Amino acid sequence: ALPILPDGERAELIDGRMYMMAPPSRKHQRISTRLVSIIDRYIEEHKGKCEVYAAPFAVYLDERSNTYVEPDISVICDPDKLDDRGCKGAPDWIIEIVSPASKKMDYLLKLLKYRFAGVKEYWIVDPEKNRVIVYNFTGDESVNDYTLQDFVKVGIYEDFVIDFGSMEL
């Protein structure tokens, strides 16, 4: 478990090593808020069983609790993984919004941790590079590259497409 941190401080624990988290920028928060709203609306309209959570939301990727992360957005479809502390096990879909301080973590370390933990789909939204990278870890596994003006298909749903161009980012 994480040590007690001062108010306002956030950290993640990956393989027993603590990584401090920088506060998100206004643009980061705008992207996160819009995406959570779009995802939540889709789930409600389709009476889905999945739930969407924005950071700070605890995800314990392994039983040993030496990996604790706070993805920017987590979608969990198995209610048995949820308790008052957060999510135990891999969410179905994770979105990380890249900031200069989180670049290495999001593109390398978390990519591998999420894949091997059993996350089905992982999106990296990089406002600085104007791109959305979609990793689908199910079946044949694929990776697709989009811009922040594109329509992006959500892999865990049959008919869900997010129009980044209409989000006025």
Regions found by a protein language model. Name each.
Residues 1-169:
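Gly/Pro/Ser/Thr-rich low-complexity, intrinsically disordered segments predominantly at protein N-termini
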